A protein has these predicted regions:
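Alpha-helical transition-metal enzyme core signature, strongest for iron centers
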Residues: 92-100, 122-137, 167-178, 201-216
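A structural signal for long alpha-helical coiled-coils and helix-turn connectors
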Residues: 107-108, 185-186, 217-220
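Active-site-proximal, substrate-binding regions of enzyme catalytic domains
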Residues: 119
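Active-site-proximal alpha-helical scaffolds that flank and shape metal-associated catalytic sites
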Residues: 135-204, 230-245
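Soluble, non-transmembrane catalytic domains of enzymes that act on hydrophobic metabolites at membranes
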Residues: 211-227
Length: 303
């Protein structure tokens, strides 16, 4: 998670000359080297994962906390857990693809001289993650759900603002995913393969999140240092707020409901997204992210 008292950096030269950032990067790079694993030899993929058991913790399902959850039979619960797990890993595949594109565009470019060495660890690990999530989906479900997320308007064509929004989006994505990884890795009701991929992903993402928190703060300080006006700040808040919303909504996939045998998936999605219990669940998933963005001044309590 992000440090509770992330200190401000020297905005204009934050990514090029920041002693604390350099120390963090060295520590994270050393840890990445020490924790390195070959994903192609690490996993002992079983031929199948039984369909008459849970693939995802019931507490993480999109129906949890609603009266609809209580109406599910054991078989329906198992089916929903299977297809919502496939949706979750599919979202990882699509999200990782996008972040790899954005980070690769910036490695060894002006302004990112200092973090570029860590970017190589980051890119390699994320490529591994995309491979094992895709392998899980294809091997045990026969498909990856297509990316149906709502595309946000283009970010403002200002390099500093674009850089900030890119890494803020990456941080949001990683923290949402990590919320699930931690619980799935610890849930003894789940198949060992499910727990294993989530444990390894969390192990790597803990470094990526520590890096992302510091970089996002430094890029935000850069924007403030150059004199970000209130209109631009309002636009940034709105953009990130919409990204938080669309990220959460992507966890509610009508195709997963259909595959689980639940009727009228689009109506079910609308009903669930409006349900008070699900609103509370969303706040729980996002609390680290919104807390961090509030703490550094991107969000405020009145956004």
């Amino acid at each position: 998670m992000c440090p509770p008292n992330t200190p401000p950096g020297r905005a204009a030269t934050a990514t090029a000359d920041d002693t604390e950032f350099r120390t963090l990067l060295d520590r994270l790079s050393d840890k990445a080297t020490a924790d390195y694993y070959n994903p192609f030899t690490t996993f002992d993929w079983p031929a199948t994962i039984p369909t008459d058991e849970l693939w995802m913790s019931p507490e993480l399902l999109s129906l949890h906390g609603t009266e609809l959850m209580d109406e599910l039979s054991t078989a329906q619960l198992q089916a929903l857990s299977r297809w919502e797990s496939v949706n979750f890993y599919s979202l990882n595949v699509h999200g990782i693809r996008e972040l790899l594109i954005e980070v690769t565009r910036r490695v060894h470019t002006p302004g990112f001289e200092l973090p570029s060495e860590f970017f190589h660890h980051f890119i390699g690990e994320e490529n591994d993650h995309m491979w094992f999530f895709a392998t899980f989906c294809l091997k045990y479900a026969g498909k990856i759900y297509p990316d149906k997320s709502v595309k946000l308007p283009e970010a403002p064509r200002d390099p500093d603002i674009e850089n900030f929004l890119v890494f803020a989006r990456i941080l949001v994505f990683e923290q949402i995913v990590d919320h699930y990884n931690v619980q799935l890795a610890a849930d003894r009701r789940l198949h060992p393969t499910v727990r294993h991929i989530n444990r390894l992903h969390h192990q790597d993402e803990s470094r990526h999140i520590a890096f992302g928190c510091r970089l996002v703060h430094l890029l935000w300080e850069r924007l403030l240092d150059r004199g970000l006006d209130e209109a631009a700040r309002h636009e940034l808040r709105g953009y990130l707020g919409r990204y938080l919303t669309t990220s959460i909504e992507s966890l509610y996939n009508p195709a997963a409901y259909r595959d689980a045998g639940l009727p009228d998936g689009f109506a079910l999605r609308r009903r669930l997204l409006a349900h008070p219990a699900r609103q509370a669940a969303h706040a729980k998933v996002l609390h680290k992210t919104t807390g961090f963005l509030n703490r550094i001044g991107v969000f405020d309590d009145h956004r």
